Amino acid sequence: EWNDIHPLNKKEGARRAALCMKKLYPGMDIVNEGPVATRMTVADGKARIEFSPATAGGMHLRQALPHSKANPMTDMSGWCIAGQDGIYRHARAKVEGTTVVVWADGVNDPKSVRYAWDDDPAVTLYNGDNLPAAPFVIEAER
């Protein structure tokens, strides 16, 4: 539920809090966070963002909730990519195992990628435990 500090789905918030608590106990080998970006490389004009295998199992893109009927978001919402000029453009993304490939028209040499880096961002990247990735900015390794 976008733009609501008091979401209706309280059970999901409680489930996530319980996972964080369980992780504190010795011997509890559970995933308590969404996909965590670890590295960005560039190949063929596209950014390749690698995620920690511990958090990226079953990683997938999910359609974001529409912010309004006039401007529905798609499952590619929330991603921006910047070239060497430093100007961020809305981007497309696709999951390949524990990697997300990000690209946009007009960006041939990616420098940086931002995910969910807005006020009230679209959240579209989840792992197999349906835990969302936190917002991040990542720079390409050169």
Which residues fall in each region the model found?
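Catalytic cores of secreted or luminal carbohydrate-active enzymes
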Residues: 1-77
